[in-house]
């Protein structure tokens, strides 16, 4: 099965998405540049157009704001930070082309991206070949920090194994062991469903499911099949606009009365876009804005919200924030922007709480370069007393180490340049 996703997008839709990214003018890449000489150049590749655009826009918003704050405090190692944002258009070939452009023409010091796991995986091949420091803020497929891990690549979001491990036992305990999966047929969905099936089978469960194109919009045939199967739980593993459409049709078919709903991720960008009846189910959040026991979270939320239209930041804003500060911390520890020295500095580095914005110990694990971050398991619900973004109740927090298992079990064997 191919990771390549070919989508075409009307120019009007492209400009609408572009305008959402902080009102930046689009002339080639989006560029955020501080005054000063010899800037540190960071290339940021994300699918600003296509079915995952809402998630990408949040990541770019988070990156834009973080860079602005960094530059107000002197940049990195005294040099201003220049952010160059390119649209992968949710297409692997386009993403790879943009990576080559950023590295070979724009001479960036590091690369970040992509939301789409297949593109993130392909970018890793380019950055490894070119020996460029690379952080994946939000692409989840396991091989990135698993069997195909690279010395230069780190990941901030969870693996699919971590998300599946965190929520599977909760779904089985509350609802039952007969599941139906609706899953996107590309790198992310393939590894996610495999991990869910592994955990469910270990608990004595049974399942059926369909794997569909990431850009699917009509789920009627699959939902009819799911209804006939009569599962205890339907897992909607789609993402972006596809997940939104699936949720809407799930409610229209009245299936919310017949079975429980859940899965790995129902991100706030998507929860905002479905009717109240579909704002439901048990899921994981990779970060959430309401953490009363972590005062640094409130400080972050209060600071960034005015820059993103008064909304609460989502996990996607957090992923960019953490990734950029991780790069800063690595450069400061290494006292260099050399890719090898930065990678050596970040491996095993524990993030301070003002960067991690989490209650537990958070670090990029040395054995596989995967961020060990807390995972929030709970219920999505319609807006609560906390306002329009009060959409999730955390029922438990699973540590990254508990969800991920040992690094040597991932298949990662990092080979450093000689």
Across the structure, where does each feature detected by a protein language model lie?
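Extracytosolic ligand-binding ectodomains
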Residues: 2-5, 9, 14-17, 26-30, ...
């Amino acid at each position: 099965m191919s990771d390549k996703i070919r989508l075409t997008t009307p120019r009007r839709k492209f400009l609408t998405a572009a305008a959402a990214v902080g009102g930046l003018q689009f002339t080639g890449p989006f560029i955020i540049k501080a005054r000063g000489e010899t800037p540190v150049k960071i290339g940021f590749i994300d699918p600003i157009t296509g079915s995952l655009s809402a998630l990408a826009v949040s990541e770019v918003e988070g990156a834009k704001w973080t860079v602005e704050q960094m530059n107000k405090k002197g940049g990195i190692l005294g040099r201003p930070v220049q952010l160059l944002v390119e649209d992968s258009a949710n297409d692997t070939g386009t993403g790879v082309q943009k990576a080559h452009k950023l590295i070979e023409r724009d001479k960036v010091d590091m690369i970040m991206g992509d939301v789409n796991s297949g593109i993130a995986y392909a970018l890793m091949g380019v950055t490894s070949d070119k020996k460029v420091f690379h952080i994946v803020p939000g692409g989840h497929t396991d091989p990135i920090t698993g069997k195909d891990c690279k010395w230069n690549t780190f990941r901030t979001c969870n693996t699919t194994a971590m998300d599946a491990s965190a929520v599977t036992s909760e779904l089985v305990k509350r609802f039952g062991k007969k599941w139906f999966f609706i899953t996107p047929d590309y790198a992310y969905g393939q590894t996610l469903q495999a991990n869910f099936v592994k955990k469910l089978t270990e608990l004595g469960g049974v399942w059926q499911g369909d794997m569909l194109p990431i850009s699917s919009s009509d789920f009627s045939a699959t939902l009819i099949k799911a209804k006939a199967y009569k599962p205890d739980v339907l897992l909607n593993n789609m993402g972006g606009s596809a997940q939104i459409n699936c949720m809407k049709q799930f409610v229209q078919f009245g299936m919310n009365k017949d079975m429980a709903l859940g899965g790995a991720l129902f991100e706030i960008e998507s929860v905002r876009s479905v009717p109240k009846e579909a704002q439901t189910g048990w899921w994981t959040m990779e970060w959430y804005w309401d953490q009363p026991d972590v005062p640094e979270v409130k400080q972050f939320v209060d600071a960034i919200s005015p820059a993103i239209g008064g909304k609460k930041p989502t996990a996607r804003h957090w992923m960019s924030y953490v990734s950029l500060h991780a790069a800063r911390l690595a450069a400061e520890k290494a006292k260099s922007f050399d890719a090898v020295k930065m990678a050596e500095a970040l491996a095993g580095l524990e993030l301070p709480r003002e960067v991690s914005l989490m209650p537990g110990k958070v670090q990029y694990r040395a054995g596989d370069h995967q961020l060990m971050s807390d995972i929030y398991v709970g219920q999505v619900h319609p807006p609560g007393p906390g306002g329009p973004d009060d959409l999730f109740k955390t029922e438990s927090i699973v540590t990254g180490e508990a969800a991920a298992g040992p690094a040597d079990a991932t298949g990662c064997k990092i080979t450093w340049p000689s």
